[in-house]
Amino acid sequence: MSHFYDLAPKDKDGNPFPFSNLKGKVVLVVNTASKCGFTPQYKGLEALYQKYKDRGFIILGFPCNQFGNQEPGSDEEIAQFCQKNYGVTFPVLAKINVNGDNVDPVYQFLKSQKKQLGLERIKWNFEKFLVNRQGQVIERYSSISKPEHLENDIESVL
């Protein structure tokens, strides 16, 4: 993949979700899990989404079960959990791998664009990548970075 907009992961129903439809938007990509100590970040992520969605901002959640088996459910169960417990309205796509031999092309691309502490691999759930309106990865945040602490960076690219 040579560009963010060439990517087309699957949505929770198994249909393509072409990133070409995101051209001109600011995108926050997050690998998520329902049974993680960071799971309450869904609330903050949804607050960010509600605050900025009308200004061309979108969050994409990518469930992943690679860290402590903290996302064991089906795509439908995950979507229901997010909506019921955190009122999530931003897209939560199909479960993927973010590391290893079967890494999803989305994360292969993101990690190649922005390393963290000199490493490409994702260390845990709820790492975040901020992508500007031109499809460039401009920032990567660790799991401990709370969504509300990303506001200045988001504002700067909206």
Swiss-Prot record:
Family from the record: Belongs to the glutathione peroxidase family.
Predominant location: cytoplasm
Catalysis: reaction(s): a hydroperoxide + [thioredoxin]-dithiol = an alcohol + [thioredoxin]-disulfide + H2O
Listed name of the protein: Glutathione peroxidase-like peroxiredoxin gpx1
EC number of the protein: 1.11.1.24
Function: Glutathione peroxidase-like protein that protects cells during oxidative stress. Has peroxidase activity reducing hydrogen peroxide, alkyl and phospholipid hydroperoxides using preferentially thioredoxin as a reducing power. May act as a scavenger of H(2)O(2).
UniProt gene name: gpx1
Uppermost EC category: oxidoreductase
Compartment(s): Cytoplasm; Mitochondrion
UniProt-listed GO biological process terms: cell redox homeostasis; cellular detoxification of hydrogen peroxide; cellular response to oxidative stress; hydrogen peroxide catabolic process
Record flagged with keyword 4Fe-4S: no
